[in-house]
Design a protein with these regions (language model features):
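Class I S-adenosyl-L-methionine
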Residues: 2, 9-34, 39-136, 141, ...
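A contiguous loop/helix-start segment that scaffolds small-molecule binding in enzyme catalytic cores
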Residues: 2, 13-16, 22-24, 97-102, ...
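Signature of uroporphyrinogen-III synthase
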Residues: 32, 88, 226-251, 258-368
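Class I SAM-dependent methyltransferase SAM-binding "motif I" and its flanking Rossmann-like core
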Residues: 33, 107-187, 232
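Short, conserved loop/helix-junction motifs that constitute active-site signature segments
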Residues: 46-47, 64-66, 184, 208-215, ...
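Short gly/pro/ser/thr-enriched loop/turn and capping motifs at secondary-structure boundaries
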Residues: 59-60, 78-80, 137-141, 158-161, ...
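Beta-strand->loop->alpha-helix junctions that form or flank phosphate-binding loops
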Residues: 72-75, 134, 217-225, 301-304
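Short, conserved phosphate/pyrophosphate- and ester-handling motifs at nucleotide-, phospho-/glycolipid
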Residues: 135, 196, 364
């Protein structure tokens, strides 16, 4: 892919150009917190014509798309797939052939147990241009927000990411993948299992069978980086019962090794620590509130989306502007009225210098 038409901004990354963005973008949404998506990934989401998403993609990121963006839900979640992978591949190819800017939003990173390779293969075979935008994998980020480093001097020089799913064509027994567990037995470091909550007892049993000590620390983290995040700690012998008692839900990851006993969380993350806040308002207002709440240590999520709709008063405004010289003051009652007013001025090709004789009155700090 060429670089013609691409601009470089002050922070040193390439921004998307209208001339080159008509292709399919596989974008990693990160571990769950919408603030953890990459800057580049968010820019493409804001511009796309079609977005294909599933449960693992952050729903709050859908609020960033254009109003006319087409949304296609493909419904992947633990134990239930609304669309199977071959169907998703077909949708990607079909949408890519339309010549629009298409985003495939995937949880975590597309190439870390995200089946991104299968989707790329389908696009390659169909001759559809594409680009992969990496995401932050939950295998590292989720333990980190809970104070667990996957590597740490003196306890773990490596980490290993394993799928908790069982595939009959790979695993040799009902207990799990012998290749995976035999490999873990011969390695030092931290083991991170993704998508393994429903098979937690079998995974722990298999680890013991291949030589792991029953008192090896284990942490299970549910809904990491998202509202409702919970962590249960124990060891290989006790963790299954503790998780069952706590009724943890998917998505969840399992961390096994000495580092699972570490807790490097900050003692006080702010006055809103452990407080969940539901946001109501327009996308711009909710984003402003989200940033403020996050800075105080709280967790926020959108519960109601609101939008500003124009009324018949727009026509009355246009008539008034034709006689603007008869007015002395112009009053704005909110930030939204200012945005709409100057948007309409541009639509009507009215020179803002016609307002030079007016005095302005505004209500609220946001209108200043």
């Amino acid at each position: 892919m060429g670089t013609a038409g691409r601009g470089v901004d002050k922070v040193g990354y390439s921004t998307p150009s209208v001339l080159e963005n008509k292709m399919v973008y596989l974008i990693g949404a990160g571990p769950g917190d919408p603030g953890l998506i990459t800057v580049k990934g968010l820019e493409f989401i804001k511009q796309c014509d079609t977005i294909i998403y599933d449960r693992l993609g952050t729903y709050q990121l859908l609020e960033m798309v254009k109003p006319d963006c087409r949304r296609i839900y493909v419904g992947k979640q633990a134990g239930s797939h609304y669309k199977k992978q071959p169907e998703i591949n077909e949708i990607l190819v079909e949408e890519g052939r339309k010549g629009n800017m298409v985003v495939r939003l995937k949880g975590g990173d597309p190439f870390v147990f995200g089946r991104g390779g299968e989707e790329v293969t389908a696009l390659l075979e169909a001759g559809i241009p594409f680009q992969v935008i990496p995401g932050i994998t939950s295998a590292v980020a989720v333990p980190e927000v809970c104070g667990i480093p996957v590597t740490h001097r003196g306890t773990s020089r490596s980490f290993h990411v394993i799928t908790g799913h069982k595939r009959a064509d790979i695993h040799r027994s009902d207990e799990g993948g012998l290749d995976d567990y035999d490999y873990i037995r011969n390695q030092e470091g931290t083991s991170v299992f993704l998508m393994g909550l429903n098979r937690l007892p079998q995974i722990m049993e298999r680890l013991v069978q291949t030589g792991a000590e029953e008192h090896t620390p284990v942490a299970v983290i549910s809904k990491g980086t998202m509202p409702g995040q919970r962590i249960v700690r124990g060891d290989i012998q006790t963790i299954a019962d503790k998780v069952n008692e706590a009724k943890l839900e998917s998505p969840a990851i399992i961390v096994v090794g000495e580092n699972a006993a570490l807790d490097f969380t900050a003692p006080n993350r702010g006055p809103l620590q452990n407080v969940h806040v539901g946001l109501v308002g327009t996308p711009k207002l909710r984003e402003k509130m989200r940033v403020a709440i996050d800075a105080l240590g709280g967790q926020s999520y959108s519960i109601v989306d609101m939008s500003v709709e124009q009324t018949e008063e727009k026509n009355r405004l246009r008539v008034a502007l034709e006689h603007i010289e008869d007015y002395s003051w112009l009053a704005f009652t909110s930030q939204n009225t200012i945005t709409l007013f100057f948007k309409w001025l541009r639509e009507w090709n009215i020179d803002v210098r016609k307002l030079a004789h007016l005095k302005f009155a505004v209500v609220g700090a946001g209108t200043r």
